[in-house]
Structure formats: C-alpha cells, structure tokens
Swiss-Prot record:
Assembles around the rod to form the L-ring and probably protects the motor/basal body from shearing forces during rotation. This is Flagellar L-ring protein. It is found in: Cell outer membrane; Bacterial flagellum basal body. The lineage of its organism: Bacteria, Pseudomonadati, Pseudomonadota, Gammaproteobacteria, Enterobacterales. The keyword Oxidoreductase does not apply.
Length: 232
C-alpha cells in the first residue's frame, strides 16, 4: 500500500499541472517589444584638415535659431493626449412568414376505392404555414482620457515618427501599466509638443494592472477548466 501511494503522488501532481495548463489562458499584450528608445550616437568625424567636414557629429543640444523643438530624431519625446471616446450600437430584426393551401377532389371514384372513401366523391385538402421572427442588438462604449509621454523609436522613410511609451503607477499592492504605440505625422504636432491620440495612426493603447485586485477579477483555473468542459 505504501508503494502504491508513492507512485500515486507523481500522477496526481501531473494531473494538477495538466489541468492548470489547460485552463490558463495567457494574455498577449497589445504593445510588444521595448517601450523606450535611446538616441543613436553619430559617427566620429575624421580630421582631414579642411573647414568642411563631410561627417558632422550629431549634437542633440544644438538648435538653430528658426527651428522649433518638435521631435525628429530617435530618442526624442512627445506627449500623447489620450482622447478616446468610441461608441457603437447595432440592431437588426427579421420577419418571415409563409402560408399555403391546396385542395382537390374527384367527382367519381373507382368501384374498388368506394369502400375507402365511402361515397362517389373524394375531397382532399392540404394546408401549411411557417413563420419566423428574429431580433438582435448590441451596444458598446469606450472612454479613455489622460496624457502619456512617449519616445520616438523609429523614423520612417516618409518622415513619420513611430512612437512607443509606457507609464507605471504603483498603488498599494498593485501596479497599473499604461502602454502606447503608433505612428505620428510631424505636421500634427502642436507647439506644445503634443498630439491627440485621435490623430495617431495604428494606435495601440493598453491599460492593464497586476496585483491581488487584478487576480480577483480573473476566474480560478479549476473553475475555468470545468467551464470549458461544460456543454452549457
């Protein structure tokens, strides 16, 4: 009996691990990869004894007199003003009906069928009907407001800027993560170095958290396992 119990423990542990793996659904983040970028160092100039140098070092602190401070290089920062307000509604209905009726008769019936019909005339009638009613509707709304400063991590060939950023806020025993990525047209950047999120292409906005509050909102692995097996 003791030998059997020793062999049963690994089997039970394997079953628990299998159930856990089947019931756990991994969450795939919308914003993947690094959430920041560092400026690229410029090439080292080669002294050739001439006033004109073909390769000039990149001086990020230098600014021409008539040039604004809009981001244009990798590592520059930009403020995204989150102004997402999306609502959608949909309703549909369908009605269908169909009725049919057919009747016919015989004035004379063959002699060998008179016992079946009981007289010299046979009347037959058939009718049928079908009806269908269906209705459906759905409503959804989403509101997101705030600000987030992101970093330029790629300058596209047409001059657009691909930006990415993350903000972490620790509250009690949980941490809130706000992640953003998208493509910004430099012409839409205001003088305060900000752009609304509604003017960002391919925007990915993610607001998630971890901690015991987030875990309380998730279904347990055993309950999720039986929910997947239930036919209801």
């Amino acid at each position: 009996m003791q030998k059997y119990a020793l062999h049963a423990y690994p089997v039970m542990a394997l079953m628990v691990a299998t159930l856990t793996g089947c019931a756990w659904i991994p969450a795939k983040p919308l914003v993947q990869g690094a959430t920041t970028a560092q400026p690229i160092p410029g090439p080292v100039p080669v002294a050739n004894g001439s006033i004109f140098q073909s390769a000039q070092p990149i001086n990020y602190g230098y600014q021409p007199l008539f040039e604004d401070r809009r981001p244009r290089n990798i590592g520059d920062t930009l403020t995204i003003v989150l102004q997402e307000n999306v609502s959608a509604s949909k309703s549909s209905s369908a009605n269908a009906s169909r009725d049919g009726k057919t009747s016919f008769g015989f004035d004379t019936v063959p002699r060998y069928l008179q016992g079946l019909f009981g007289n010299s005339r046979a009347d037959m009638e058939a009718s049928g009907g079908n009806s269908f009613n269906g209705k459906g509707g759905a409503n959804a709304s989403n509101t997101f407001s705030g600000t987030l400063t992101v970093t330029v991590d790629q300058v596209l060939a047409n001059g657009n800027l691909h930006v990415v950023g993350e903000k972490q806020i620790a509250i009690n025993q949980g941490t809130e993560f706000i992640r953003f990525s998208g493509v910004v047209n430099p012409r839409t950047i205001s003088g305060s170095n900000s752009v609304p999120s509604t003017q960002v292409a391919d925007a990915r906005i993610e607001y998630v958290g971890n901690g015991y509050l987030n875990e309380a909102q998730n279904m347990g692995w055993l309950q999720r396992f039986f929910l997947n097996l239930s036919p209801m």
